[in-house]
């Protein structure tokens, strides 16, 4: 993880750690002139590592975004941001996207009253995301919500009720709330 962060910069979904300022100096010395290919590859890798996608998953999302009307880049980011694992991360129910994936895989999360164990589940507006009624599930989410540093900067397309361990997707995400800097 730390090699990826040093190479690509801060990836908030992958880990909460930040690259040290000294590593930037090292990158500038060996970088030289950046070709268009290198810039595109780095941006693609940022997307992959931030959202925890495989190459094939990313290609599927690019294909879906290309077919839809509108800007392909904006639609791609909207598709990625509406994934269940990412919404849990944005709500503060998990500290990282891999942590949110684990919560979903271990069947701690309900969407509209049904257990969903697929992290790539695409959430829709008016979806209600809650925890299982088990004490262990609630304790896990409570720890994450209590230690969540970005509770006050919740995106406007999401609302959370921390006492009932419930999140609500109000609408499709607006592009200005995406925390990743992509060129």
UniProtKB/Swiss-Prot annotation:
One GO molecular-function entry: rRNA binding
Residue ranges crossing the lipid bilayer per the database entry: none
Gene3D superfamilies assigned: Ribosomal Protein S4 Delta 41, Chain A, domain 1, RNA-binding S4 domain
Cleaved signal peptide residues: none
Pfam family name, one: S4
Xref: InterPro entries: Ribosomal_uS4, Ribosomal_uS4_bac-type, Ribosomal_uS4_CS, Ribosomal_uS4_N, S4_RNA-bd, S4_RNA-bd_sf
Main localisation: plastid
Record keyword rRNA processing present: no
Name of the molecule in the record: Small ribosomal subunit protein uS4c
Naturally occurring in which organism (per UniProt): Crocus nudiflorus
């Amino acid at each position: 993880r730390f090699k990826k962060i040093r190479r690509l910069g801060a990836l908030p979904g992958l880990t909460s750690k930040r690259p040290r300022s000294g590593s930037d100096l090292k990158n500038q010395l060996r970088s030289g002139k950046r070709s268009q290919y290198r810039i595109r590859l780095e941006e693609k890798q940022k997307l992959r590592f931030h959202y925890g996608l495989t190459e094939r998953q990313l290609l599927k999302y690019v294909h879906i975004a290309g077919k839809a009307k509108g800007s392909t880049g904006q639609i791609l980011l909207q598709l990625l941001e509406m994934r269940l694992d990412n919404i849990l991360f944005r709500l503060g129910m998990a500290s990282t996207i891999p942590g949110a994936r684990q919560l979903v895989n271990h069947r701690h999360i309900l969407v509209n009253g049904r257990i969903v164990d697929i992290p790539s589940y695409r959430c829709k507006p008016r979806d209600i995301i809650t925890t299982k009624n088990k004490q262990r599930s609630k304790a896990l989410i409570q720890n994450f919500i209590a230690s969540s540093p970005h509770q006050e900067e919740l995106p406007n397309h999401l609302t959370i009720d921390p006492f009932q361990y419930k999140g609500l997707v109000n609408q499709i995400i607006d592009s200005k709330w995406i925390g990743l800097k992509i060129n």
